[in-house]
Amino acid sequence: MLNQKIQNPNPDELMIEVDLCYELDPYELKLDEMIEAEPEPEMIEGLPASDALTPADRYLELFEHVQSEKIFPDSKTFPDCAPKMDPLDILIRYRKVRRHRDFDLRKFVENHFWLPEVYSSEYVSDPQNSLKEHIDQLWPVLTREPQDHIPWSSLLALPQSYIVPGGRFSETYYWDSYFTMLGLAESGREDLLKCMADNFAWMIENYGHIPNGNRTYYLSRSQPPVFALMVELFEEDGVRGARRYLDHLKMEYAFWMDGAESLIPNQAYRHVVRMPDGSLLNRYWDDRDTPRDESWLEDVETAKHSGRPPNEVYRDLRAGAASGWDYSSRWLRDTGRLASIRTTQFIPIDLNAFLFKLESAIANISALKGEKETEALFRQKASARRDAVNRYLWDDENGIYRDYDWRREQLALFSAAAIVPLYVGMANHEQADRLANAVRSRLLTPGGILASEYETGEQWDKPNGWAPLQWMAIQGFKMYGDDLLGDEIARNWLKTVNQFYLEQHKLIEKYHIADGVPREGGGGEYPLQDGFGWTNGVVRRLIGLYGEP
């Protein structure tokens, strides 16, 4: 099997902590000045006052009690509940009765909260449908209509209809939506594309950025910045003209670059890192450093095993969620242990490629509007970012892009994130050719490309394959003239999804693809989800290009 070639990854790329009890290594101890110079962010941007409160903010010890007692099997359930009355009244009632001998926490929750609705539980797939028919019939099932904001609910109302991924995810997600949109366009659902375009523009206008998802507990972070790719899709499909989104793109860019001008070399603030040579690169970040509402108990348990201050671990867990790769060996000091997570000290190759695309899009649209100074400024920014990426994140010896540990000043692991520079046109042809060789020998399997070559038990690692990574690899390699590799990945992935669909009559979030026998992907913090938005989107687009498998 092809995957047998990657059993022994390059030892230079491993970052395994030798002494697992000693978390503050000498590389970090020498950085006191840098850390002290990194100011704490102010209050999160977005909704002011009470509407920005998360369930953990509102319910305080009641929230912690419910989550620690595991009233619900999924930690996300309680944050998604809606209160039946003013949260303050609920909290007062709880404090009055919680010490009674006959107090029943579950009954208290059921009496004071509406549980989240499971929309897709009644949908039954028709086994006679082809894969294409199945996907087209799922769009209405995954569509949520706009509704008035439920008072004190964590759900943020949106002005237009939107698509959710499915399963436990009953809200829209930022980077998921781009890959879902690819399929909507192929299915001729321009109506939904327009709605989602309006929604994301509205979020930028109202929150200053696109949150991870439309929940209050997602406001403190974003996700991989793919709005520029969405705008490109809107333009290509004649849904919305790109010019109307120039201001939105600039606002998103300002969010990601906040604080950059005040940094000196080896300093970081929020999403921005000033490198030793003065260049600017970006990292993932979350403005909060508390356990995530939707994974509260899991985060508390992870922090207990870290040997570090809990708030640092919580920040890195949150930043990992902002990356979309939650979680992966990419963010771990010890590749087998989530408690060693250090997301904020890595400069991710995919994030900086997406920001290169954002800078290029602003330059291109500014040129269309005759704004020559803005065009020149952002072309220079894109060029500077590409130079910095080549300096710090390109491994010339192995011919691959890798994440960069900016605190240890060394390259990190190789993963499928390395294909994003090709997808956005940031690589040169020599880099693309060399990267293709590495992907063939290290990530390609009969089922598609692996997220990484490391087996850690995390979901964004071997043996799993994910739809967005397949799409970016397929299109990225074809863009640089490697049709053979792009087509092979496409056919392998379509075969994986179709074979599983014929057996199970559903599409899922991720697939086990390491051994050529398609089955459910594992790992992560929650059970495998079906639906599934971005898998549907990518597969529907590929069917349009390659036909049904």
Swiss-Prot record:
GO terms for molecular function: alpha,alpha-trehalase activity. GO terms for cellular component: cytoplasm. The lineage of its organism: Bacteria, Pseudomonadati, Pseudomonadota, Gammaproteobacteria, Enterobacterales. Belongs to the glycosyl hydrolase 37 family. The gene is treF. HAMAP family: Cyt_trehalase. Keywords: Cytoplasm, Glycosidase, Hydrolase. It comes from Escherichia coli O81 (strain ED1a). Hydrolyzes trehalose to glucose. Could be involved, in cells returning to low osmolarity conditions, in the utilization of the accumulated cytoplasmic trehalose, which was synthesized in response to high osmolarity. Pathway: Glycan degradation; trehalose degradation; D-glucose from alpha,alpha-trehalose: step 1/1. This is Cytoplasmic trehalase. One of its GO terms (biological process) is trehalose catabolic process. Substrate binds at residues 168, 175-176, 212, 221-223, 292-294, 324, 525. It comes from the Bacteria. It is an enzyme of class 3 (hydrolase).
